[in-house]
Amino acid sequence: MLKKERQAYIIQQINIHNKVLSSDLSTQLNVSEDTVRRDLQELSEEGKLIKVHGGALSKSFHFTIQNENIYLLPEKKIIAHKAISLIKDGMFVLLSGGTTIRELVKSLPPKLNATFITVSVPTALELLNHPNSEIIFLGNKLSKNAQMAVGAEVVQRLNEIKADLCFLGTNSFDANEGVTDLEWDVIEVKKAMIRAAHKTVSLSISEKLNTVQRLLVCKPEEIDILITELEPDNETLQAYRDKGITVL
């Protein structure tokens, strides 16, 4: 595979999943990790991604970077507007992080009066712009890559919460394997969020469906509702409906 083709693949993967590991790319591309690191360094110098230890992050995922080029933004807006229909006045709502969650928060009706609990720094900052909702940030140790609070204290606080809904930003979701991700600390927090909620809603662009990462967040049966940009009767979603998941 030519360098141009490798780098195009890397950009595609980072756009879909927001973050990539050098070791995974090495396996997928059948090249050495040194080659992958050189590609990531070059793409970083071109301003196309953020190189971090062990991999890279999407620039649109990193809220400190001023970048309006969010991948598949129209599709994420569709997902956000579908999700808003589930939120009612008086609800306690858990929010993870990610660009789709941020679009959800940006689209909240100004008159909505709900309590939002989040572990995500960008999500909390976006919620500050909402006039009528209470914000609870569960802070502790921060994951620089995910820009969210992680650790035993956060998990313990989540264990004491009984929320109506949990909106989960999704890295990968396969109808057989479930929701998967890359970072252990982040996964432990997401598991606690799912346990803390009466219903869990996965927000996912369709490109993240039928993909699998290294670490399990939850089995498919633990997701109550899946929201994508697709029409609910799209055949791509049939496998998820077969698992008893409500598809919006």
List the model feature ranges, each with a label.
Residues 45, 74-75, 118-119, 148-149, ...:
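Short, intrinsically disordered/low-complexity patches at protein termini
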